Amino acid sequence: MRTAIVAVLIGLAVLVSSFLLGSAFELKGPVAEVVDGVTYSWDAQDFAGFYYDIDDDVGDERLSLAISAGALEDSGAVYATRAQKEMIEFSGWGSRWTIGFLGEAHFAGYCGGYLFDESGSEVLFRDERIARVLVDDDEERTIQRDVPLRLEGGYKLAVKDVNPVGEKVSLELSRDGVRMDSTVVEPSKANATLEDRTYLYKRPIGGEDVVFIAVHFKNAFSGSGDVLVTVDGVWQLSEQTISLREGDEWGEMAVYDLDPDNMTFTMTNEDRKISFSRGRSKVLMSDIGIKTADQDDVDNAINTTTGRPENPLRFRVYREVEDPGTYEIRGHLGKVVNGSTWVWNASSFAGFYYDMDEGLGDESLNLNIAEDRLKGETGAVYTSRAQKNRMEFEDWGALWTISFLGEAHFAGYADGIFRDESENPNMLAEEQLIKVLIDDDRKETFDTDSPLGLEDGYKLSLESVDESGEKVSVALFKDGALMDSAVIEPSRSGATLKDQTYIYSGRVGGADDVVIVAVHFRSAFTTGDDGFAEVDGIWQISDEALFVEEGDDHGDMTVEEVDPGDMTITMMNEKEILLKSDDDLPLLEDIRIRTADQEVINNTINSSTGLPEDPLRFYVYKAVTLEP
């Protein structure tokens, strides 16, 4: 694992393909259901909100929720995490204990090597403390007398002088301009030891001086007035340690056990009942919470065939992220094992679109491993299926919604007035998708002086209302240009749905006379010279189409079939995809495959399990950038 001095969470190669967000977002776990007697478990390999380092296979956070009578009773929620050994990036310094805590990696202590010895064998976890790792890298960089090494937390390490032969380097550590320490290292002297080459800054914890900053010097040079020093290892811990004591509360959870011998830590909701009710978000611990669907059709009646509720309340765990940076929305871990098949779908992989309130979203990705690759046409298969759902103003009917590469799109009118009014209601028949811009049933009043604002430059102007309020003249504009005008009769006796609805149709992509804008008028009236109208349904789709045609390439995948009968889109990889160590593959545009930078890959078959000992690890993911 590397923690760069400049806080960049994922490599620059990913930044160019990531989504940009300007505020907090949620790292979502797989969708689950509130079913009595069921226990759900998530770990670092299937919940992106927990910390996991795929390269070193480090990260062992777990959360289990035992549901009883629609709630989590006393100790029904259990969070456990375990520290694991891993090498410090500059391996000459030895190893450390890393523990995932509430989704982030923390330092639990040194466990062997030079920094362990220099810290008096002190392990923070035994003192009920952990700390953030601010810097851990072994990249070479050159510093000069006038250009100090910038660390985190306002620290700077400056080279004050180098003797003429380059053997002695005088250093000064400062924080926010205040001198904290000074010393001399000797990286270039004959037979220099690790101690000679390493600058250490310590702070007292648990009766011992623990290393908080370490810098390894590769060499030094002084000549002609120039001073150049090369460092190839930097390590820094946060001085703000986190206290973990039995009984401490974190949201609805409390510390239940801290075991320094096994390096484990457990929290439960002891003495606190957590109920599940629809449309709620409940903080469980720190930034990790539980969100339930705002679900209209909850049905807990038991199906006699399955023995399960017909349609129980849906929920998911999540972690809210606010700190700027680039994050990976990753699916569950996979392994490159010959003959294995790995599947991700909309309810298990948050990189796909899923509307938990409506239970809407049907994307799936199957990866079929053959030796160390995905063979052409059969190795990777992506399928998206359109689903029928009602519009917000339900009298208008239903539409086909299809999720494609993680985003929801309009695939056609399934039934109702808009299907009847559209010459080409099925968008998949034209190999195209359209974005829904507005689908709203909120009541809104506008008048002859203030048009109804729509998306993409459209406005609906109320031109006039007759004295009886029966006839309403409207005009539709786009970017100031008149597109359409009509008269509707929302208030006349016996008015039909068509009488009450303004509809604008036009050509979208390859489809003729598709309903683009619709507004339902609830009533209209006049007051003096002013006309007013109340609307309670607005619908708008984009007038530009996204074409999805057979043969189109999306990353390493190609559209194989667009089926307007089954309302599906299928893509496959036409070319073979090799899965090798330390790779980042653009499988489906922004949906990618990351393989581990794995030092040991052992495909020897274990006689007990029948599986390889330590195959190459990978996961699919989508990158999201949170801007400051």
Identify the meaning behind each predicted range:
Residues M1-A24, V159:
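Secretory targeting signatures
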Residues G22-P628:
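Surface-exposed, beta-sheet-biased, low-hydrophobicity segments with strongly acidic/polar composition
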